[in-house]
Amino acid sequence: MLKLSRSANLRLVQLPAARLSGNGAKLLTQRGFFTVTRLWQSNGKKPLSRVPVGGTPIKDNGKVREGSIEFSTGKAIALFLAVGGALSYFFNREKRRLETQKEAEANRGYGKPSLGGPFHLEDMYGNEFTEKNLLGKFSIIYFGFSNCPDICPDELDKLGLWLNTLSSKYGITLQPLFITCDPARDSPAVLKEYLSDFHPSILGLTGTFDEVKNACKKYRVYFSTPPNVKPGQDYLVDHSIFFYLMDPEGQFVDALGRNYDEKTGVDKIVEHVKSYVPAEQRAKQKEAWYSFLFK
């Protein structure tokens, strides 16, 4: 029989199989050997004491403190809440963006008003201006006339506020266009003088009566002048009052009426600009694994 050393905490003792007796206890004969395992208390340490993972025991009247465990749990909860909040914000924002994008996609496919198309006009500097000049940038178009007493000036002032806010707050630049509905009186020089009182980026467009009529027809703009007007006679032109937002592909996006103020108008334009996806990128999205999001 092997002798245990008191300096050891754990010893394996092997005894030959035999029949033992004493104090009424019996050890049945078994084939081979059996192992007896004992824990020996040494150096004042308690067996099976719990020690924090990666740390040292903290003693307080013989008990392990739970402060480190509670602190770790608190940090985990805070991290979980922070990550959860960030993910919730991200997914909600992406959901709104995708919904707007899907709506724009649907408008391209069906149900979109047939607005826009080929036209030929002249700007207030004498340069040719066609629908091709709308490509590559967002444009906003307003139809009016220089002798308009109140509505046109009010709408152009509002457009100036939109342009300033879009540029300074969102870094968005639009191409603002003013197309006259009164080509008989609004020559390039007249438009240049008239628009000098408004935002400097607004470009005036005019043309012959037939050219202006064609442009108005393409955008479904109603306008009329009094019959039998004599040269030099003062008159008013009745016309539709809308801003037409066009995307960089020259496609109609939205029409903003007089109900849009300096804040809601900006919000609507920003929404459309941020949700716009170029044609090449749209084609890639339809082929990607997540294409079901756009259906």
From Swiss-Prot:
Present with 2550 molecules/cell in log phase SD medium. GO terms for biological process: cell redox homeostasis; cellular response to oxidative stress; intracellular copper ion homeostasis; mitochondrial cytochrome c oxidase assembly. It comes from Saccharomyces cerevisiae (strain ATCC 204508 / S288c) (Baker's yeast). Belongs to the SCO1/2 family. GO terms for molecular function: copper chaperone activity; copper ion binding. The gene is SCO1. Required for the accumulation of subunits 1 and 2 of cytochrome c oxidase complex. Thought to play a role in either mitochondrial copper transport or insertion of copper into the active site of COX. CDD domains: SCO (cd02968). This is Protein SCO1, mitochondrial. Keywords: Copper, Membrane, Metal-binding, Mitochondrion, Mitochondrion inner membrane, Transit peptide, Transmembrane, Transmembrane helix. The keyword Metal-binding applies. Pfam families: SCO1-SenC. One of its GO terms (cellular component) is mitochondrion. It is found in: Mitochondrion inner membrane. Cu cation binds at C148, C152, H239. The keyword Nuclease does not apply. The chain crosses the membrane at residues 76-92. InterPro entries: SCO1/SenC (IPR003782), Synth_of_cyt-c-oxidase_Sco1/2 (IPR017276), Thioredoxin-like_sf (IPR036249).
